[in-house]
Swiss-Prot record:
The gene is HA. Residues 18-529 are extracellular. Disulfide bonds join C21-C481, C59-C292, C72-C84, C107-C153, C296-C320, C488-C492. It comes from Influenza A virus (strain A/Leningrad/1/1954 H1N1). It holds the Pfam family Hemagglutinin. Glycans are attached at N27, N28, N40, N104, N144, N172, N177, N286, N304, N498. This is Hemagglutinin. Major glycoprotein, comprises over 80% of the envelope proteins present in virus particle. The extent of infection into host organism is determined by HA. Influenza viruses bud from the apical surface of polarized epithelial cells (e.g. bronchial epithelial cells) into lumen of lungs and are therefore usually pneumotropic. The reason is that HA is cleaved by tryptase clara which is restricted to lungs. However, HAs of H5 and H7 pantropic avian viruses subtypes can be cleaved by furin and subtilisin-type enzymes, allowing the virus to grow in other organs than lungs. Palmitoylated. One of its GO terms (molecular function) is host cell surface receptor binding. Keywords: Clathrin- and caveolin-independent endocytosis of virus by host, Clathrin-mediated endocytosis of virus by host, Disulfide bond, Fusion of virus membrane with host endosomal membrane, Fusion of virus membrane with host membrane, Glycoprotein, Hemagglutinin, Host cell membrane, Host membrane, Host-virus interaction, Lipoprotein, Membrane, Palmitate, Signal, Transmembrane, Transmembrane helix, Viral attachment to host cell, Viral envelope protein, Viral penetration into host cytoplasm, Virion, Virus endocytosis by host, Virus entry into host cell. InterPro entries: Capsid_hemagglutn, Hemagglutn_HA1_a/b_dom_sf, Hemagglutn_influenz_A, Hemagglutn_influenz_A/B. Homotrimer of disulfide-linked HA1-HA2. Interacts with human CACNA1C. Binds to sialic acid-containing receptors on the cell surface, bringing about the attachment of the virus particle to the cell. This attachment induces virion internalization of about two third of the virus particles through clathrin-dependent endocytosis and about one third through a clathrin- and caveolin-independent pathway. Plays a major role in the determination of host range restriction and virulence. Class I viral fusion protein. Binds to sialic acid-containing receptors on the cell surface, bringing about the attachment of the virus particle to the cell. This attachment induces virion internalization either through clathrin-dependent endocytosis or through clathrin- and caveolin-independent pathway. Plays a major role in the determination of host range restriction and virulence. Class I viral fusion protein. Responsible for penetration of the virus into the cell cytoplasm by mediating the fusion of the membrane of the endocytosed virus particle with the endosomal membrane. Residues 1-17 form the signal peptide.
Length: 566
């Protein structure tokens, strides 16, 4: 009986078996990502795909300074407003920066035809050659070219006029019919500008042009218009009741433009041979110029980023991330960050069967923890970790490469008569923007889900790799761990980790220990049965003795009468 009780105690006492566990890395990261199924999943590592910062400045784009118009508008610059004289020497630029409320535009009031289209054309120009299309001194010998000035275009307190146009007036009491032509021999597009004067009364018409009825004709291969001055009283603007309407055309190489008029012509003086540049553009911004370089400029400021998306501004110039309306686009590269809970012991129970990661394992994503007579320790599985890193890095780079279509996105211009078209364009742009934002967010959600599943799969594969080696030389204890049926020193542990575990070498020892443990279990069951029988018999005897004693007492005091019949 004593021997059986000893076996029972041995079976119930704890044994320090050698163990090896499969686990994953955890750290103190607070990065969170979203997936298709979950929000704010804490992960060990992630990368941000959304740029949301800028420097608030206008910078050189790829080393080339922008054309900063300052207080001048595109119209004031290209016509040559005297207050924009400092811009005359500018020949090349990376982009054009205009302030929202430019003071110096058309100094003499009037309508600028197709102004928004001209802005669109100039937005793709990175340099031009400014030249005299009709030299002032010799092109108009029968007309006055110096008296055509106005107080509305004053410069330094004196009446003046545009630097790229000439106001032709009568000379010696007459204004002869004129005909002037120019052949484009520049081998590139030439921008030609002119104007038509509309006096406020017939007296001004006669004084300036010496005739009541006049016309202006402009003809090229692609342009053909005849203008008749409209003489009428108008409200004064900048002190002028008259108006000048401004026109322009692009002259193709080899083409000819012909001007004919008998009055009211604001003639071209300088024209522009244009050089197109796909990286150029026009932005409207209050940002100041700074000594800085960038690859991407927005009206808000410069962006120096290689990320595929930005939420700073939809208008961009240069090699820029794509604009989306998102506030967060973060792609997971690591694992779920779930450090083990200390109160549950070292080995918790990712991958559906391991509760927490190991902060102690810092040299890899997946690995092992072992415990034997020589001690315990962590070791990363470098092969699976490196394969995962390579796969995820390639995936992130691929996503960035596919989505990082860097481009210039300039705003579109519409005049006041095109409001319906402008509103429609905004709706179309908003629709595309919504689609891009949805695509970007969905892409990140799907890839995050796949990455976390990928990590789970890798941990499971590592677990199965160990399980297939150990077979019945160890038992699963349900928390990502195996308990050996044999002694496993550090050399043995290393063989399990590197996949060279010698199963036959340890199978005999494991078999004996398994049988011993199974035998202890059977003996334990026998002991339990004997104890149960003894306990039942003893309980019955105690019950019978108690009943006999009670009966004897009751008979002796007359409370119970006993009759024995034979």
């Amino acid at each position: 009986m004593k021997a059986k009780l000893l076996v029972l105690l041995c079976a119930l006492s704890a044994t320090d078996a050698d163990t090896i566990c499969i686990g994953y890395h955890a750290n103190n990261s607070t990065d969170t990502v979203d997936t298709v199924l979950e929000k704010n999943v804490t992960v060990t590592h992630s990368v941000n795909l959304l740029e949301d910062s800028h420097n608030g400045k206008l910078c050189r784009l790829k080393g080339i300074a922008p054309l900063q118009l300052g207080k001048c508008s595109i119209a004031g610059w290209i016509l040559g407003n005297p207050e924009c004289e400092s811009l005359v020497s500018k020949k090349s630029w990376s982009y054009i920066a205009e302030t929202p409320n430019s003071e110096n535009g058309t100094c003499y009031p009037g309508y600028f035809a197709d102004y928004e289209e001209l802005r669109e054309q100039l937005s793709s120009v990175s340099s031009f050659e400014r030249f005299e299309i009709f030299p002032k001194e010799r092109s108009w010998p029968k007309h006055n070219v110096t008296r055509g000035v106005t107080a509305s275009c004053s410069h330094k307190g004196k009446s003046s006029f545009y630097r790229n146009l000439l106001w032709l007036t009568e000379k010696n009491g007459s204004y002869p019919n004129l005909s002037k032509s120019y052949v484009n021999n520049k081998e590139k597009e030439v921008l030609v500008l002119w104007g038509v004067h509309h006096p406020s009364n017939i007296e001004d018409q006669k004084t300036i042009y010496r005739k009541e009825n006049a016309y202006v004709s402009v003809v090229s291969s692609n342009y053909n218009r005849r203008f008749t001055p409209e003489i009428a009283e108008r409200p004064k603007v900048r002190g002028q009741a008259g108006r000048i309407n401004y026109y322009w055309t692009l002259l193709e190489p080899g083409d000819t433009i012909i001007f004919e008029a008998n009055g009211n012509l604001i003639a071209p003086w300088h024209a522009f041979a244009l050089n197109r540049g796909f990286g150029s553009g026009i932005i409207t911004s209050n940002a100041s110029m700074d000594e800085c370089d960038t690859k991407c400029q927005t009206p808000q400021g410069a962006i120096n980023s290689s990320l595929p998306f930005q939420n700073i501004h939809p208008v961009t110039i240069g090699e820029c991330p794509k604009y989306v309306r998102s506030t967060k686009l973060r792609m997971v590269t690591g694992l779920r960050n779930i450090p083990s809970i200390q109160s549950r012991g070292l080995f918790g129970a990712i991958a559906g069967f391991i509760e927490g990661g190991w902060t102690g394992m810092i040299d890899g994503w997946y690995g092992y923890h072992h415990q034997n007579e020589q001690g315990s320790g962590y070791a990363a599985d470098q092969k699976s970790t490196q394969n995962a890193i390579n796969g995820i890095t390639n995936k992130v780079n691929s996503v960035i490469e596919k989505m990082n279509t860097q481009f210039t996105a300039v705003g579109k211009e519409f005049d006041e008569l095109e409001k319906r078209m402008e509103n429609l364009n905004k709706k179309v742009d908003d629709g595309f923007l919504d689609i891009w934002t949805y695509n970007a967010e969905l892409l990140v959600l799907l890839e995050n889900e796949r990455t976390l599943d990928f990590h789970d799969s890798n941990v499971k594969n590592l677990y199965e790799k160990v399980k297939s080696q150990l077979k019945n030389n160890a038992k699963e204890i349900g928390n990502g761990c195996f308990e050996f049926y044999h002694k496993c020193n550090n050399e043995c542990m290393e063989s399990v980790k590197n996949g060279t575990y010698d199963y036959p070498k340890y199978s005999e020892e494991s078999k004996l220990n398994r049988e011993k443990i199974d035998g202890v279990k059977l003996e334990s069951m026998g002991v339990y049965q004997i104890l149960a029988i003894y306990s039942t018999v003893a309980s019955s005897l105690v019950l019978l003795v108690s009943l006999g004693a009670i009966s004897f007492w009751m008979c002796s005091n007359g409370s119970l009468q006993c009759r024995i019949c034979i």
